[in-house]
């Protein structure tokens, strides 16, 4: 697959749907050494101590729950090696073939027993929506939705005695950027011609839930939503001269984004890490799934100071602070 197609098929949502459609009754995912270097197992596994969440229908039925899958689990690299001991292909052979795209299926000998307990609780969480009416009588009925997610992880497993996951960059900073944009657009004498919606969406960290609900059931007529601009975790660790418009190549917004960047003297840089599948991991994807043109404007990677490597700073943030208690306001901004 190309990067975008791979991102789609790599999403947990799509994997579960495909497995259920093909008759699976359970699924075990395995880690791999390449991802372990970027996101250590100990970091990722902390998230599994937190409850999963699903949207529910009006009658309380869970959305996208795939009841055919009775149990799922994920194993570390070492766990995968133990599971595949004696199999036709070892874990390390699978890891090697993963890098070359030459994986083949085989029957796994043995019996796996999974057990667990589930407690269900209904939780209400709200999106917050503000509206700036358009100034053009012919276009004011069209709406552009600016989004940023208002949630983070909250209280979780302690790291060095700290169990508060603050989410300063992910995504308090994104919310701040959206609110600042709303403030400036409202004060601008040249009022926007189309109506603007500023939507702080909930439960992004639980699977784009707030954005999915808004994109499916917006507060305005759905066919009046003409575009979405999303801001999520802008890693502004140094002054940059560019932005990264993720998903622009799949959107009719490309010419508009290019024109706006040209007016501001800002460069546009392709996604520097397409292997991270960010295209399907943030709120703009909920709008894409509903056929609404959307783009995720991420922080750039070209530092104004030629002695600073902005991409290295971004990579270090992902490795050391992403979804960690250390994502705090004392990081340089």
Where do the protein language model's features map onto the residues?
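Active-site-proximal beta-strand/loop segments in catalytic clefts of secreted hydrolases
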Residues: 1, 30-33, 75-78, 117, ...
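Extracellular/luminal Protease-associated
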Residues: 1-64, 68, 133, 141, ...
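Second-shell loop/turn segments in exported
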Residues: 1-16, 65-73, 80, 115-119, ...
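Short, solvent-exposed loop/turn and secondary-structure capping segments
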Residues: 2-4, 31, 37-44, 86, ...
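Acidic/histidine-rich catalytic neighborhood of metal-dependent amide-processing enzymes
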Residues: 8-18, 35, 154, 160-252
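Metal-dependent peptidase/peptidase-like ectodomains
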Residues: 54-91, 201-306, 312, 318
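Soluble metallo-hydrolase cores and metallopeptidase-like ectodomains found primarily
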Residues: 61-167, 183-187
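His/Asp/Glu-rich mid-to-C-terminal helical/loop segments that flank catalytic regions of hydrolases
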Residues: 183, 187, 298-333
């Amino acid at each position: 697959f190309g990067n975008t197609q791979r991102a789609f098929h790599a999403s947990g949502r799509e994997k579960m749907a495909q497995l259920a459609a093909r008759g699976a009754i359970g699924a075990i995912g395995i880690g791999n050494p390449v991802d372990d270097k970027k996101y250590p197992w100990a970091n990722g596994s902390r998230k599994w101590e937190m409850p999963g969440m699903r949207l529910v229908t009006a009658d309380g039925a869970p959305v996208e729950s795939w009841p055919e899958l009775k149990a799922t689990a994920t194993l570390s690299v070492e766990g995968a090696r133990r599971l595949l001991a004696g199999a036709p292909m070892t874990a390390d052979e699978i890891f090697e073939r993963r890098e070359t795209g030459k994986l083949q299926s085989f029957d796994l000998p043995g019996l796996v027993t999974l057990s667990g307990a589930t407690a269900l609780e209904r939780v209400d969480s709200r999106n917050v929506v503000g509206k700036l009416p358009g100034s053009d009588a012919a276009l004011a009925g069209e709406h552009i939705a600016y989004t940023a997610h208002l949630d983070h992880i909250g209280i979780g497993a302690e790291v060095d005695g700290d169990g508060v996951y603050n989410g300063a960059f992910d995504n308090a900073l994104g919310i701040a950027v959206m609110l600042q944009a709303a403030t400036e657009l409202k004060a601008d004498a040249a009022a926007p011609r189309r109506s603007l919606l500023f939507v702080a969406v909930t439960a992004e960290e639980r699977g784009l839930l707030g954005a999915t609900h808004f994109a499916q059931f917006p507060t305005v007529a759905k066919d009046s939503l003409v575009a979405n601009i999303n801001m999520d975790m802008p890693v502004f660790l140094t002054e940059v001269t560019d932005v990264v418009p993720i998903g622009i190549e799949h959107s009719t917004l490309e010419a508009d984004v290019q024109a706006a960047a040209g007016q501001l003297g800002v460069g546009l840089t392709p996604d520097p890490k397409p292997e991270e599948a960010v295209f399907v991991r943030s709120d703009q994807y909920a709008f894409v799934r509903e056929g609404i043109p959307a783009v995720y404007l991420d922080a750039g990677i070209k530092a104004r100071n030629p002695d600073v490597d902005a991409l290295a700073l971004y990579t270090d943030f992902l490795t050391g602070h992403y979804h960690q208690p250390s994502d705090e306001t004392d990081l340089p901004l």
